[in-house]
């Protein structure tokens, strides 16, 4: 049967023309493709159903397995927990017995210590009673000694009181004379100091105004120089970035041209697609395969050219964006640096004005200190500093050599500050010494009038009073007392 069918088919094809044979072959191929597609769809549907059944069975088996596994684990865990409970109960009983024994021993110790505490308290009370008796006897003896010493001191105090009264009256007269002379002397000194201060103040005002004008002119020149440097930097920046700007403009023009070319290519591709659709219609109506292959090759070439142009366009856009970003960052950095330079110049101007205001007359006359080195030694030091193996370091030292005067002046100010601090410390020590002298003088000499009017004065005695206190006071060494007026005159 198949051979006959083949013969019939061969006979049937033999009676057809070339175009009919091609059409027949195409229809046959389409029928075979449809049959194969139907078989593939049926197989896919069958496999999907089988997969769903397998998934359902897998879920059910997993559920059963988990149930069995949970039961096994529960039994195992129950046995372990029972063993742990027995062990813990035994441990708890053992710990409870141990703590009961400790509590019993602590109760015994507490009773013994309470007994010892009671014994110690009774002995302590006995000792306190003994000490009270001893203290009372000692107080009685001290009271007797105090009364006897008080009688002696009162008689001695009355004699000294009369002597001090007479001496105080004489010293009051002397102090009044000294105070009058000192007030007159200080009033003359105050007037003279005010006149000197006014004249010095006028001179300093005039000198400060002249110095301020000079510094202002100097700082105007510095600001002008900074502005010129800023303009030079800006011009240099514009010259250095001019080529990059031109390159950026060229890239932008190329970008525009590339966009135009892409648009034209898109239109050309659209035309080619239209022609391809027409060729496909012609092909379906019976044209040759050769024309279709040529059209496909032309389409692939055009697609490659379009892709190549797109890559070039993206690369050009990335390069242009990178150049623009770099130029923006450089311009921002240059602007910030110029603003910092201007702010630094303004800050220097303000600091110079403040320094000129705070400058003393001595600093204006002698702004620099004299070096302890000779001229030859200074030249040798400078030559050694300049003789360096590093050329950059040598150039930097040469560039910053004008700052030597500034550092000399700064070091002079630091030395002056140290000298002023040392002088302040010495003056504070001298002030403390004078205060001590004045306090001693007032303690030994000055007595207020109210104290002399009182009938009884408080007497401070040593802790242990003896019968020989009066004789020891007479034998004490008398210190030489110097008046405060004499000390002040010597210091002035």
Curated annotation (Swiss-Prot):
Which InterPro entries does the protein's record reference? DRC1/2_N, DRC1/DRC2
- One Pfam family assigned to this protein is NYD-SP28
Instruction: List keywords of the entry alphabetically.
Output: Cell projection, Cilium, Coiled coil, Cytoplasm, Cytoskeleton, Flagellum
Segments forming a coiled coil: 16-95, 256-318, 373-401
Q: Does the keyword Disulfide bond apply?
A: no
User: Superkingdom of the source?
Assistant: Eukaryota
Q: Name one GO biological process term.
A: axonemal dynein complex assembly
* Chief localization: cytoplasm
Q: Where in the cell is it found?
A: Cytoplasm, Cytoskeleton, Flagellum basal body; Cell projection, Cilium, Flagellum; Cytoplasm, Cytoskeleton, Flagellum axoneme
One GO cellular-component annotation of the UniProt record comes to: axonemal dynein complex
Recorded phenotype for the gene knockout or disruption: Morpholino knockdown of the protein causes strong ciliopathy phenotypes, including pronephric cysts, axis curvature, left-right asymmetry defects and hydrocephalus. Cilia length and number appear normal, but cilia are dyskinetic.
Self-association state and partner proteins as the record states:
Component of the nexin-dynein regulatory complex (N-DRC).
UniProt function note: Component of the nexin-dynein regulatory complex (N-DRC), a key regulator of ciliary/flagellar motility which maintains the alignment and integrity of the distal axoneme and regulates microtubule sliding in motile axonemes. Plays a critical role in the assembly of N-DRC and also stabilizes the assembly of multiple inner dynein arms and radial spokes. Coassembles with DRC1 to form a central scaffold needed for assembly of the N-DRC and its attachment to the outer doublet microtubules.
Q: Which family does it belong to?
A: Belongs to the DRC2 family.
Provide the protein name: Dynein regulatory complex subunit 2
